[in-house]
């Protein structure tokens, strides 16, 4: 590749105020080999003179006359003049940071298959503040992304020149969305893009920008969205996406784009409702409230050149026009409750972005500022507040945002601490270990990799070139160091915590069935065969662990190994909660000493007056939602009690009425015959089943699990719901492909085991799910599943079992649903049954009490009718947010699935597992693309 390898096209019209600064950002590039083609496009100010003056001082700059034909024609003139194989665009009022072209060209030189490289970007406010930073994370084939929205601004990408030319360059008929249209055509080839996460491109906010013309933006954008769903004759040569995408999502993406332009109109003081005329549909639109809220949130402030933090002062002013627009959008979408769902998401975004230190309330949502190193007490909230946006800070710096319900005017400190540990625990632990343990680590060059050592003990490996910094602790190395610190065994390599060396018999024998892991662990002698041991950490019970007894006892090393294998990453979360949350990081001693001090503290009372306490579920399953703390609405107490009775789960009641409901995972049993030690009191008894574990001899492993989502298997049905219906022949084609490619079925329990230990599933795995519980599952799907050796999870709407799918009535597709007898037959045949709620509502539109009623009533019905609790919850329509997710865990669901279309990672939240929808028209080849395509 030539030394000067990037041609940078800069259209300039009346840009005398900003052109020099844009050129300066180009001249500051660490890659010096570039040329700038400045296309002067009929300016009436001094732009032309300035451009020529700049060219006289730098031979890499050339000036071309654009004749005032518009920005697309100007860029095309620059493309025609470009001499180099790599191409970039830079508007005359935007900026790039110094390393953009160096990093991008290096990636393109290393990988000839790449079409381009894009980077993170941010907006530059008039006052010079950098706001709305968007790191670049998405890589690979980006056609599907651009078919929905414009992924990045034009100057945040370096692309191969020949691809832009063969794609037809810019469409000069477009006055807006011309860059989106070009990227869509370039990505139609299917060649991958790489991403540089760092923010290296700055987009200047301008009050009179063409990108703020709402009607024009809507018309042009809808044209781009539609073009993505049909062939494009402008693109030359063979392309991967010749026919474009299916058109079934055209309406929903059009509505999303209408929300973006509506925000521009609202921010400009213009009535946005006429914009909806362009996206009216004859059928209901499956709207995306989160995307709609995101569009309104991002675009409404742009006409005023404001930042997201300014929303706090705008919310009251703009509530009426936003309300009016969303009410009309709900009518257009024919989707009751849509307006409230979008508003809730918008409230969350506004509160998360509002200035810290200001307690803000919008509707039923309120913001709280939480400093993680300060003690966490119970927080009383104002009447009417149901949803809390908790803005978490660590030593005064923003650290994360959590969404939690405020049930009956209270957020218990224990629930908040547990949520912080559950959502942000690993980041907090890494920060602590960086200060306490990182200095003891060193790197050794082993040729193919670098070995991380602590003293003389290897603790992991990292790629060549890795620097010894905090990032080293974000993975297996950090996990190994944590275990060494927790058990005070810095000389143990990681594998010894799972398979210890020859056990010692040193230490005072003990017979108690409780082991505090931060203290001295002595042999258990004598011990019954395979005793159930209560493991505690910092005085907090983790759960029951069944240990293997040898020679009448259990050695300390084996107790450590059992704890690590049984609790997995829950050890880290509990250690963070008990030793770090609510305490200063820079004082207080080492992690183990902090936990020992916590173990000596007195425990809380079992139940406060008039408090209904639900005790620990599934004590043998450590680390899932059953290990978290929840506050639940007292308005749903009867449904929660019904669910507990149906599943034979213990309840602690106090008084004849209740003012609060709490799920307390610390209430774990001891064995009836064994007394509990004084410093880790046990408050209840509970029987539990052991898990059944599968093994596989396969050498291949699955690190990211595809969870497939089907609905119906039948020959006919309403055309509007064709994507949710697959014919038996095509479904058999899918199963045959899975069998022939060596896939095997796994259960949610197996996935949970892998997630707890962060260890891949053995073999090539898939998890098959069906939503709704249609009667055709028994007739068509189950026989084929059995024939090809697969199992499935069936999610049923319990109030509609034996009836019809009333939620699809608007589409004219009345389908019979399985009755309880059929579900019992399927359960006996090995089909796992999950909940799809009681009535199939949009859960985010409901109050907290109604969410719990839906989830708990459905769970109780399945347990009562089938004799087993549902294995998981499938959120109806995939409609979920942080509040719904939290409440689902509190109702007792160990897993929950969404409709987010990607593979499930071992680090995913168990209550927000993604699923890959399989449309009815997908062939086995299409399924192969789904399974083998981009993972995250």
Kindly label every feature range from the protein language model.
Residues 207-363, 369-378, 389-450, 455, ...:
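C-terminal subregions of glycosyltransferases and related glycan-biosynthesis enzymes
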Residues 425-511, 568-650:
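Cysteine/selenocysteine-centered motifs that mediate thiol-based redox chemistry or coordinate metal-sulfur cofactors
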Residues 1-223:
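Nucleotide-sugar donor-binding/catalytic module of glycosyltransferases
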Residues 203, 789-810:
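A short, conserved beta-to-alpha structural element at the edge of catalytic cores
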Residues 297-350, 648, 652-704, 920-936:
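Membrane-proximal basic amphipathic "stem/tether" segments
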Residues 356-389, 498-532:
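Short, basic/aromatic recognition patches
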Residues 783-789, 816-834:
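Acidic (Asp/Glu)-rich catalytic clusters
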């Amino acid at each position: 590749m030539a030394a000067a390898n990037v041609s940078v096209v800069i259209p300039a019209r009346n840009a005398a105020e900003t052109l020099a600064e844009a050129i300066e950002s180009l001249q500051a590039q660490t890659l010096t080999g570039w040329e700038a083609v400045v296309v002067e496009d009929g300016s009436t100010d001094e732009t032309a003179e300035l451009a020529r003056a700049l060219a006289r001082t730098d031979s890499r700059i050339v000036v071309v006359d654009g004749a005032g034909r518009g920005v697309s024609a100007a860029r095309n003139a620059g493309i025609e003049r470009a001499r180099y194989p790599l191409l970039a665009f830079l508007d005359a009022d935007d900026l790039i940071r110094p390393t953009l072209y160096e990093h991008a060209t290096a990636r393109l030189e290393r990988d000839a298959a790449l079409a381009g490289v894009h980077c993170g970007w941010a907006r530059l406010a008039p006052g010079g503040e950098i706001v709305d930073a968007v790191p670049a994370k998405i890589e690979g084939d980006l056609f599907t992304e651009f078919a929905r929205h414009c992924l990045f601004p034009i100057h945040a990408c370096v692309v191969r020149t020949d691809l832009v030319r063969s794609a037809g360059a810019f469409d000069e008929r477009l006055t807006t969305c011309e860059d989106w249209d070009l990227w869509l055509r370039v990505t139609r080839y299917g060649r991958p893009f790489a991403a540089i996460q760092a923010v290296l491109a700055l987009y200047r906010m301008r009050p009179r920008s063409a990108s703020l013309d709402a009607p024009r933006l809507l018309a042009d954008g809808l044209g781009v969205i539609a073009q993505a769903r049909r062939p494009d004759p402008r693109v030359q040569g063979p392309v991967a996406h010749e026919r474009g995408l299916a058109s079934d999502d055209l309406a929903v993406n059009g509505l999303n784009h209408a929300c973006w332009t509506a925000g521009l109109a609202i921010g400009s003081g213009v009535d946005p409702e006429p914009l909806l005329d362009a996206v009216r549909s004859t059928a209901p639109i499956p709207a995306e409230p989160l995307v709609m809220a995101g569009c309104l949130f991002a675009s409404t402030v742009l006409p005023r050149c404001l930042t997201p933090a300014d929303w706090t002062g705008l919310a009251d002013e703009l509530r009426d026009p936003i309300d009016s627009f969303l009410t009309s959008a709900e009518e257009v979408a024919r989707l009751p409750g849509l307006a409230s769902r979008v508003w809730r998401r918008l409230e969350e975004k506004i509160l998360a972005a509002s200035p810290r230190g200001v307690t803000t309330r919008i509707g039923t949502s309120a913001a709280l500022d939480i400093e993680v190193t300060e003690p966490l007490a119970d927080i009383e909230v104002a009447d009417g507040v149901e949803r809390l946006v908790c803005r978490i800070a660590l030593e005064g710096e923003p650290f994360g945002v959590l969404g939690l319900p405020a049930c009956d005017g209270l957020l218990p400190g224990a629930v908040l601490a547990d949520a912080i540990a559950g959502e942000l625990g690993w980041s907090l632990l890494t920060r602590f270990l960086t200060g306490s343990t990182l200095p003891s680590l060193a790197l050794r060059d082993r040729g193919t990799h670098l070995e991380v050592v602590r003293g003389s003990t290897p603790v992991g490996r990292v790629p060549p070139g890795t620097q010894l910094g905090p990032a080293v602790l974000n993975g297996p190395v950090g996990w190994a160091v944590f275990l060494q610190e927790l058990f005070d065994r810095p000389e143990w390599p990681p594998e010894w915590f799972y398979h210890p060396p020859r056990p010692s018999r040193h230490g005072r024998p003990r017979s108690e069935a409780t082991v505090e892991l931060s203290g001295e662990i002595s042999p258990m002698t004598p011990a019954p065969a395979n005793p159930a041991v209560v493991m505690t950490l910092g005085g907090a019970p983790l759960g029951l662990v069944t240990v293997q007894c040898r020679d009448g006892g259990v050695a300390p090393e084996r107790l450590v190994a059992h704890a690590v294998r049984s609790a997995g990453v829950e050890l880290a979360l509990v250690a963070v909660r008990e030793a770090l949350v609510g305490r200063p990081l820079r004082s207080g001693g080492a992690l183990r000493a902090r936990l020992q001090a916590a173990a000596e503290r007195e425990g809380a009372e079992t139940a406060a007056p008039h408090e209904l306490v639900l005790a620990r579920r599934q004590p043998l399953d450590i680390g899932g939602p059953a290990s978290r703390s929840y506050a639940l609405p007292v308005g749903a107490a009867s449904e929660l009690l019904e669910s507990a009775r149906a599943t034979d789960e213990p309840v602690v009641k106090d008084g004849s009425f209740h003012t609060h409901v709490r799920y307390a995972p610390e209430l774990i049993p001891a064995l009836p015959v064994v007394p509990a030690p004084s410093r880790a009191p046990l408050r209840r008894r509970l029987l539990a089943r052991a898990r059944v574990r599968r093994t596989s001899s396969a050498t291949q492993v699955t690190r990211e699990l595809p969870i497939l989502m089907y609905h119906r298997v039948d020959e006919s049905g309403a055309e509007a719901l064709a994507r949710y219906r697959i014919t038996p022949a095509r479904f058999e084609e899918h199963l045959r492909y899975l069998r022939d490619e060596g896939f095997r079925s796994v259960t949610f329990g197996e996935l949970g085991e892998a997630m707890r230990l962060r260890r891949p599933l053995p073999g090539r795995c898939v998890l098959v799910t069906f939503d709704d519980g249609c009667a055709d599952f028994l007739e068509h799907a189950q026989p084929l599943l059995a024939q090809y050796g697969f199992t499935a999870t069936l999610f049923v709407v319990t109030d509609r079992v034996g009836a019809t799918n009333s939620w699809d009535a608007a589409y004219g597709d009345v389908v019979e649903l399985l009755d309880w007898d059929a579900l019992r037959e399927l359960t006996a045949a090995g089909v796992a049954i999950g909940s799809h709620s009681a009535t199939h509502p949009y859960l985010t539109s409901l109050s907290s009490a109604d969410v719990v009623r839906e989830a708990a009533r459905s769970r109780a019905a399945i347990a009562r009718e089938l004799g087993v609790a549902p294995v998981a919850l499938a959120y109806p329509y995939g409609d979920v947010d942080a509040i719904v997710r939290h409440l689902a865990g509190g109702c007792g669901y160990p897993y929950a699935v969404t409709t987010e279309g990607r593979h499930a990672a071992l680090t995913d939240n168990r209550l927000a597992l993604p699923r890959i929808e399989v449309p009815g028209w997908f062939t086995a080849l299409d399924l192969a693309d789904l399974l083998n395509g981009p993972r995250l």
